[in-house]
């Protein structure tokens, strides 16, 4: 029974720490950019878009399609960085916890 109590305590600690990490991630800013930095997208640590900056030289009606492509590229760059950051944080958090194969945390 001591083992079960210890496991429950560890699970509670993990749950508390996960909530803390979620708040830390939400407070972080991660920016991604397209080629030459003409478009920069900044996400929070959970993947929400905080801002989009567009080089003024692109604000030409003829450049709409180019601008859209650059925004997509910048967003994808920032999202990949966020995903990697979340993976690293969760790895730190679960370092001592052995999860069953195929099981992952809710991130």
Swiss-Prot record:
InterPro entries in the record: YbaB-like_sf, YbaB/EbfC
Subcellular locations according to the entry: Cytoplasm, Nucleoid
A UniProt-annotated Pfam family: YbaB_DNA_bd
Keywords for this protein: Cytoplasm, DNA-binding
One GO CC annotation: cytosol
Record carries keyword Transcription: no
Single Gene Ontology MF annotation: DNA binding
Chief site of localization: cytoplasm
Keyword DNA-binding appears in the UniProt entry: yes
SUPFAM superfamilies listed in its UniProt record: YbaB-like (SSF82607)
Function: Binds to DNA and alters its conformation. May be involved in regulation of gene expression, nucleoid organization and DNA protection.
Disulfide bonds: none
Subunit structure: Homodimer.
Family: Belongs to the YbaB/EbfC family.
Name of this chain's protein: Nucleoid-associated protein Rru_A3472
